[in-house]
Design a protein with these regions (language model features):
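Short glycine/proline-centered coil/turn motifs in the loop regions
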Residues: 55-58, 67, 137-141, 150
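Strand-loop-strand motifs at the edges of beta-sheets in extracellular beta-sandwich domains
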Residues: 71-82, 150-170, 178
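C-terminal edge beta-strand
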Residues: 102-109, 187-199
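Right-handed parallel beta-helix/beta-solenoid
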Residues: 198-248, 256-258, 278, 283-286, ...
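Acidic, glycine- and Ser/Thr-rich low-complexity intrinsically disordered tracts
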Residues: 202-229, 297-310, 314, 318, ...
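Beta-solenoid repeat scaffold
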Residues: 221-226, 248-255, 261-322, 337-346, ...
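Extracellular beta-strand/beta-solenoid scaffold signature
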Residues: 274-277, 319-335, 356-367, 385-396, ...
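Right-handed parallel beta-helix
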Residues: 276, 341-352, 370-384, 399-414, ...
């Protein structure tokens, strides 16, 4: 488009020269202005760049103006937002000669009707990253997207500006919702959509040698309907009476901010899947974190606890109701009567009085009394800073139970002088009733002994079908003797610290997307973070309290272990004067990172992984360790192995695609002259201890020269140092970025064509919600 130049020029009559003088005449051309643009039209609310050319003057600057919309000093037109097309005029005026200008007519085109063009969504799979971008046409950008009705799957979020659905779904099903888009002119459009999430852990499926859970609990609020009446219990009211009188389908609200002291027995009623009883704070849902979001003590008015990760409170208003156990011993404040079923708890603080004696379980079943269908949702469950409290919730004897989006703190036992030796945030696996399925999802779990433990007591059955996902398992460093701000028992003795996650009796367990931080030795254990040890222990006068106990079909994947004395302990071993348990094996461990494993800093054993059999029968077998990125203590082995040569060999051992620090003694014996690993030569150890085995495509970083490649099984790698591997950021194996650079020699070098070591992207997607 070219505009005609404006004519604002003038001429000057030359003076008359004296006689005999030659005069040169100077004629001044008028200043001319022209404007141009790449188009004669622009969309509603759009932009169009204009250019001005000024002739016959050294000052080529112009002033811009427009009849509608706005235009910058550089000539960029911002068109008005119009509902019908119309013409506007753009003017460029010479600064040197304000009478000289040029104009251009531009058609502003009305936007097409706003419409969402996305009408179907691709399906997703639980546990796998999902991404989909919604599209719209017409209207005037930018767009803003919201969910108008319905809900997204847990783990999926809508980004309002980008219109993208992303995250890692944790529950299968078909989710129906309506999405709304609004343009900058405040026009709106809606579209009904359905997102189908398939279950990657359907009944009968496997991860390597391990069978995955056969049953998964659906625990959304929509899955626990309570269509009955609501009863409110205010401060000073009778909560127990409300429990006793509630009908199936009712809701009991406890006054937000109020304290309800006592021991409350949750009674048996003939409820069903369509008629749950909900017990919750009276605060509205808008005062709590959204469903699927972890609660913190902020919602009980506590801005921060010493030594814990930041709560990042947006406010500290107390909107929770508190149940507090006032007894001097025993368990409480919540006990389930025999047969109690279909109860959901939301937005409550559950605790005990300080300064009292040892308390066992804050939440649990009555002794030898089964319960079922229990959901703890957005709860703060905690002991006190110095007192002994054994467990937050005890799941033994409970079936179909879930702990979701909750916060557990201050469960600990005092060393030497204490009344207990093991404390857990969540425990189970004892007693004589069927147990499971369980769902432990998106919680902060803190305890001195084991953050999560299944087993360790008398039992005739094994809990099964256990889903443990996207939790943060944490021990405060202020519990470590000698650490600044040390906190111990009332007498100053330290708390007994053992590990983060231990199984002594469990089967079909999926442990995925979890963050494990801080554990140390110095007590009865050696600071391993993860322990898989089936136990038929001595309890009381019984020396074989659980011959039926087993740990089988365990999948550990897409998780991180940091700040520990040792990594993973896999052992079938007799201990505590007990006997041989029923079984241990079929473990799939893959895509896990282990860093800051330091035996000196955390007072413990040091090996990255221990694999040991101490039984003459029910031999350990079916172990797959694949795609691990791990940096153990440099003075300890990457793999410690043990089995007496009088026992059958351990079977079906797979160790592939791992990227680990070799250590001073890369593959070493767990001890004893009759140990199959006594030679400590890697090839000899592997072939003597395991049959059959697969041991290929592993990179052992900084292997000592003594352990030359000829002393190893074939087809493995020996990078001289971490720099040779080409991590994105090794950071001395402390919180680094363990992606491989594109030029790494171990890029796509695995048996499956993937990078050696863990899939860092997959881990990050899984643990995003765990922090």
């Amino acid at each position: 488009m070219q505009a005609v130049a404006g004519n604002g020029g003038s001429s000057i009559k030359p003076p008359t020269a004296p006689s005999g003088t030659t005069v040169q005449n100077h004629f001044f051309s008028p200043v001319e202005v022209s404007v141009s643009a790449p188009s004669l039209s622009v969309s509603s609310g759009g932009t169009l760049q204009f250019t001005a050319v000024v002739r016959n003057t050294s000052n080529t600057a112009v002033n811009w103006s427009t009849s509608l919309g706005s235009i910058s000093a550089q000539g960029l037109l911002q068109a008005p937002k119009v509902t019908s097309s119309q013409n506007i005029t753009v003017v460029a005026t010479s600064i040197a000669s304000p009478g000289s200008n040029a104009t251009a007519g531009v058609m502003v085109l009305a936007a097409q009707s706003l419409k969402i063009s996305t009408d179907t969504l691709t399906s997703g799979v639980t546990g796998s990253s999902y991404n989909a971008t919604l599209s719209a046409s017409g209207g005037t950008s930018p767009y803003t997207w919201v969910i108008a009705t319905g809900t997204l799957p847990t783990g999926i979020k809508l980004k309002q500006a980008a219109g993208s659905l992303s995250g890692t779904p944790s529950q299968s099903g078909t989710y129906n919702f309506t999405v709304s888009v609004t343009d900058s002119a405040n026009h709106q459009a809606t579209q009904a959509l359905a997102l189908n999430i398939a279950d990657d852990t359907a009944s009968g499926s496997f991860d390597g040698p391990a069978e995955l859970p056969r049953v998964y609990l659906q625990t959304s609020v929509a899955d626990t309907p309570a269509p009955g009446k609501t009863t409110t219990v205010n401060a000073g009211g009778d909560f127990q009476s409300a429990l006793d009188n509630a009908a199936c389908g009712d809701t009991i609200t406890l006054q937000a901010g109020a304290v309800f002291p006592g021991l409350f027995t949750v009674p048996q009623k003939s409820c069903d899947d369509q008629h749950w009883i909900i017990i919750r704070t009276s605060a509205p849902d808008t005062s709590l974190p959204a469903e699927g979001t972890r609660i913190t003590p902020c919602y009980a008015g506590v801005a921060q606890l010493p030594g814990r990760p930041s709560f990042n409170c947006t406010s500290t208003k107390n909107v929770m109701a508190q149940l507090i156990y006032t007894g001097k011993a025993g368990s409480g404040p919540i006990m389930f009567a025999s047969g109690a079923n279909h109860y959901r708890f939301i937005g409550l603080e559950v605790t005990r009085l300080a300064g009292k004696a040892f308390i066992s379980d804050l939440i649990g079943p009555s002794q030898d009394s089964p319960a079922d269908h229990i959901v703890l949702d957005r709860m703060w469950v905690h002991g006190t800073a110095h007192d002994e409290t054994t467990r937050g919730v005890y799941l033994a004897g409970i079936t179909s139970a879930a702990v979701v989006d909750s916060y557990f703190t201050d469960f600990h036992c005092v060393s030497m002088t204490g009344s207990c030796t093991d404390a857990q945030a969540v425990g189970g696996g004892g007693r004589n009733f069927p147990a499971g399925p369980y769902r432990i999802f998106d919680n902060f779990l803190e305890a001195s002994g084991e953050n999560i433990l299944f087993g360790g007591g008398e039992a005739t059955t094994s809990p099964a079908d256990i889903e443990i996902r996207q939790n943060h398992l944490f021990k405060p460093l202020i519990w470590m003797p000698g650490h600044p701000g040390f906190v111990g028992g009332t007498n100053g003795r330290p708390f007994v610290v053992k590990n983060n996650f231990e199984l002594k009796n469990a089967e079909r367990v999926l442990f995925e997307g979890n963050i494990l931080e801080y554990t140390w030795g110095g007590f009865s254990q050696f600071g391993y973070s993860i322990v898989l040890t089936p136990k038929n222990q001595a309890v009381g006068i019984s020396t074989n309290s659980c011959p039926a106990c087993r740990v089988t079909d365990v999948t550990i994947r897409y998780s991180t272990v940091s700040h520990a004395a040792a990594g993973i302990n896999i052992a079938n071993a007799v201990s505590d004067n007990g006997g041989i348990a029923a079984a241990g094996g079929r473990y799939s461990i893959h895509d896990v990172t282990l860093d800051d494993i330091d035996s000196n800093a955390y007072a413990g054993a040091g090996p990255l992984v221990l694999v040991m059999n101490g039984w003459p029968r029910n031999i350990l077998g079916g172990i797959s360790i694949n795609h691990i990125t791990g940096f153990g203590d440099a003075s300890h082995p990457a793999l410690s192995v043990g089995n007496d040569t009088s026992n059958p060999k351990m079977s079906n051992f797979i160790y592939t695609n791992n990227l680990v620090l070799a250590g001073e003694y890369p593959i070493w014996t767990s001890g004893g002259k009759t140990n199959c690993a006594y030679s400590t030569i890697p090839l000899t150890v592997i072939s003597t201890c395991f049959q059959p085995y697969t041991f290929v495509k592993n990179a052992f970083i900084d292997t000592p020269a003594y352990y030359s490649p000829s002393k190893w099984p074939a087809d493995n790698f020996f990078p001289p140092d971490p720099a040779y591997v080409q991590f994105v950021n090794y950071n001395n194996a402390k919180g680094g970025d363990y992606h491989l650079q594109p030029s790494s020699p171990y890029k796509n070098a695995g048996t499956d064509g993937k990078d050696l070591g863990a899939d860092i992207d997959a881990i990050q997607a899984q643990i995003a919600q765990a922090y």
